[in-house]
Amino acid sequence: SHSLLKKLKKQSDYYNFNKPTVGSFFRDVNTRGLSATIADRKMWAEMKMNPTDLADVSGYTYTYLMNGQAPLKNWTGLFRPGEKIRLRFINGSAMTYFDIRIPGLKMTVVAADGQYVNPVTVDEFRIAVAETYDVIVEPQGEAYTIFAQSMDRTGYARGTLATREGLSAAVPPLDPRPLLTMEDMGMG
């Protein structure tokens, strides 16, 4: 909306609620030493960024959807045990990257952005804005959670593959929030 953009134009990290703190400074001094910690903080300050600057707007502001459904609505896709299912993941977000997994199921990636690829079996994959991935899964149990957590770990979209309506599987916790390094910024 207009107010989001207005706030970001005034302060680019307005919605970053996970900035480095005095506590993280002392933790870094303990693990990396004083001079390395100061040098690292100085480099980030010169770029007017910080290592938690993964997304301009995050799950603190947005609700991430799967097939138009919020996580609590739990979109459900039905299957028969042993059936091969092709799932197409489309990242329709404006700026969010997602890490997608289906706990308990391997996914075989068969297409990327509409182009067939040599099949690759994965536990998880990252999808950028406007990308699509087609995967094949072969569920055997009753219910599996499709879990798409934002790269900055502030929220997720979720759905369920199930043998019948009303079933759901456990929703995994968000992974720990990653920190950017100078190498991530092309400065290493």
Kindly give the residue locations of the regions a language model identified.
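Terminal connector regions
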Residues: 142-171
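Short, charged beta-turn/beta-strand-edge "cap" motif at the junction between a beta-strand
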Residues: 92-95, 139-142, 152
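Histidine-centered copper-binding motifs that mark active-site loops
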Residues: 1-129, 135-136, 165-187
